[in-house]
Amino acid sequence: MHRSSYCREETTLCQGVNSTWVPPADTVPEASLTPHSPPAPDSPAPSPKPGYGYSACEEKPGDPRIRRPMNAFMVWAKDERKRLAQQNPDLHNAVLSKMLGQSWKNLTSAEKRPFVEEAERLRVQHLQDHPNYKYRPRRKKQAKKLKRMDPSHHLRNEGYTGGQPMVNLSHFRELHPLGGSGELESYGLPTPEMSPLDVLEPSEPAFFPPHMREDPDPGLFRTYQHEMDFSQEKTLREISLPYSTSPSHMGSFLRTPTPSAFYYKPHGGSSARTPLGQLSPPPEAPALDAMDHLNHAELWGDFDLNEFDQYLNMSRTQGPGYSFPMSKLGGPRTIPCEENSLISALSDASTAMYYTPCITG
């Protein structure tokens, strides 16, 4: 009776602790009494799990990594680093390395000799232990770092999702020659030194009014590279007038916009076009409307038509005239060279006036 109550009490205590049924002591095998029994020798060893000193990229057991033999500085710094770290526990490892390098440079050859001999002994021993050793540096992390620092790598990773390939920027650095083949042949380089005439068609003149473009022979016009600076009153007194003295022709001539960046030169009736040079910026439109109220008699009073015809005949007998700016016609007529220049300029202006009725009419 007493024994059965003791067994019932022991069973209840065991159930309260482990909540599992415990068999009687005489039926439990002897091996199960030990709390931590070692595994049987037949069972395989448990495989190491990642995160406990092992990784998936661990080197193969048959090919362990062999460390390089230490040189003289490493042999000396092995103990010296420990001593400096104990003396300066707050210093960073990089600062310690700088201090060690400076201290090693300050050593004499006699002080370095024992460490050099020890490094040579370690090298010979390493060569005997690993005759097939080959140094293979680990540069994968450095290569990734350089790749991250590459600006083209950032451009590719900017999240460009437009569906179109990115434009190659290398062709903007290449300078194509003007005379070569390609799209830049007819347009020229996009530089400030480019002339405005480079982007025009060969058949279309530059800065000509619409009525001048209808002229059957635009080769009579030639560019003048310097803008002529003279007043409007002086222009009216120096430019020769057409032979027709009717006021209607005079008014139409005044209203015709004459660009000051051009002067006229005949080419003997040939239809060949003169190549256009570099063009100056177009001048401001002259205020010709302010002269409509002037009397036509005052405008015609300073011109002698007979003298003008005499100069015209002389210029035709002497040959083709030289082009001369109109702003230089105000000098004295006593010098022969200036008189010849004046005759040539008047001849050019009269030839231009022959085409005035066709242009304005």
From Swiss-Prot:
GO terms for cellular component: nucleus. Residues 17-65, 127-163 are annotated as: Disordered. A motif (9aaTAD) lies at residues 306-314. One of its GO terms (biological process) is angiogenesis. PROSITE patterns: HMG_BOX_2, SOX_C. SMART domains: HMG (SM00398). InterPro entries: HMG_box_dom (IPR009071), HMG_box_dom_sf (IPR036910), Sox7/17/18_central (IPR033392), Sox_C (IPR021934), SRY-related_HMG-box_TF-like (IPR050140). One of its GO terms (molecular function) is DNA-binding transcription activator activity, RNA polymerase II-specific. Residues 66-134 bind DNA. Residues 148-157 have a biased composition (Basic and acidic residues). It is found in: Nucleus. Residues 147-208 are annotated as: Important for transcriptional activation. Residues 234-360 form the Sox C-terminal domain. It holds the Pfam family HMG_box. Transcription factor. Binds to the consensus DNA sequence 5'-AACAAT-3'. Also binds 5'-CACAAT-3' and 5'-AATAAT-3' but with a lower affinity. Acts partially redundantly with sox7 during cardiogenesis, acting indirectly through nodal-signaling to induce mesodermal, organizer and endodermal tissues, which then interact to initiate cardiogenesis. Also acts as an antagonist of beta-catenin signaling. Binds target DNA via the HMG box domain. The 9aaTAD motif is a transactivation domain present in a large number of yeast and animal transcription factors. PANTHER family: SOX TRANSCRIPTION FACTOR (PTHR10270), TRANSCRIPTION FACTOR SOX-18 (PTHR10270:SF204). This is Transcription factor Sox-18B. The gene is sox18-b.
